[in-house]
Amino acid sequence: MMQKKKRWREFFGTIAIACLLVFLAKIFVFFPTTVKGASMKPTLQDGDKVIVNKLAKQFESYGREDIIVVKTDNFYVKRVIGLPGDVIEVRNDQLYVNHEVIDEAYLYSNKKQAEKKLMNLTEDFGPITVPKNKIFVMGDNRLISRDSRNGLGLIDKADVLGELAAIYYPFEHMKIIN
């Protein structure tokens, strides 16, 4: 009888520790969220469930081309294009960062769709120098995305919540984000 009580106590103790670890990880390390809207298509779909790494904010480990979640007037999932001091420009549908051509492979399917409509995916703009403590972000679906070009503005580093780590639902979209 004592043996059975001891096993139950160990079992519930293990469950309590596991719950505490999950709770602490959610507070300090990651959080789940849902992608809303089509501004990151085709990389992310409306309704995708994702995990965001909060440590990326603490250590500012996100960089150009990483996908981040920011909180301004709302929550936004966007791609980092420019960091403080970077010079950002788009000419003839080509992104330049610090006067170097950037190959945005994640835009190929969107560029093909824009070409079929005889449109540029991204309007010309810049050059823009990203100020200290700000970042420049854009959505992958440039035709409809509200981002640093058109209404969202430059993002305060303090408004970054974290970097996208994984898509966990729907299962056919499941993947780790590099």
Model-inferred region functions:
Residues F12-F28:
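Hydrophobic membrane-insertion alpha-helices, especially the h-region
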Residues L24-K41:
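Aromatic-capped interface at the extracytoplasmic side
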Residues M2-W8, L20, L24, P42, ...:
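Soluble "head" domains of membrane/secretory-pathway proteins
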